[in-house]
Amino acid sequence: MIKLLFTYICTYTYKLYALYHMDYACVCMYKYKGIVTLQVCLFYIKLRVFLSNFTFSSSILALKNPNNSLIKIMAILPENSSNLDLTISVPGFSSSPLSDEGSGGGRDQLRLDMNRLPSSEDGDDEEFSHDDGSAPPRKKLRLTREQSRLLEDSFRQNHTLNPKQKEVLAKHLMLRPRQIEVWFQNRRARSKLKQTEMECEYLKRWFGSLTEENHRLHREVEELRAMKVGPTTVNSASSLTMCPRCERVTPAASPSRAVVPVPAKKTFPPQERDR
């Protein structure tokens, strides 16, 4: 009887609070097995010291569509606690904690606690790795400085390890052989990528030097062609003279190379040519 009276007081308190703020819609509440449920609600308000003085720390909004199946917010009030648990149900997730127990945990349930800040366990974006399909996911491997130093020294000595070396190194570093193998694979991939980047940079510089050398050779070829063709055309008009005897063109600078006139061809009369 006391519990029922307490539930009714809570219900009417919520209604009065909703009517006091006319901007908000009416909030319907009902009692079922000690659980007070908000069927239509937009924002969930954290309540402080609820059992002592019924004071509210913020406001409550109602959804416009009460049959909305995308979001259902349940406020669970334990008997001996002043904190509220928030359960948000979305498609693919269960809306009640009892359904998961009855179905054997076939669907997952997303639970949020408004009384504390989300921790790293609630939303961890770190990478996970699987040894096989049945193994649970585990977080990305975090190495200490000493472990990293020993692994780097081992990698400098040998880029690949046999199973026996993996066992010895894993035992020394307190790791699993599979983790040692994965670390060496990643290290070889990083080393190969670094070497490829260095080779690409070297080839770029070499290509630039060859391009400059090619341009320089082209300029030299053009200069040589200009030097060979230019003076020849100038001297050909100034150093040639006309010989009045043979009417031939001879160079004036070299008289010893004068062309000897060729005698005219002797012609015969028609009678002698017939003989």
From Swiss-Prot:
* Keyword Nuclease found: no
Region Leucine-zipper, residue ranges: 203-224
Per UniProt, what is one Pfam family of this protein? Homeodomain
| Residue spans binding DNA | 136-195
Subcellular location field? Nucleus
Q: What organism does the UniProt record list as the source? A: Arabidopsis thaliana
For this chain, the family text in UniProt reads: Belongs to the HD-ZIP homeobox family. Class II subfamily.
Report keywords, A-Z.
Answer: DNA-binding, Homeobox, Nucleus, Transcription, Transcription regulation
Under which name does UniProt file this protein? Homeobox-leucine zipper protein ATHB-17
Q: Where is this region: Disordered?
A: 95-143, 252-275
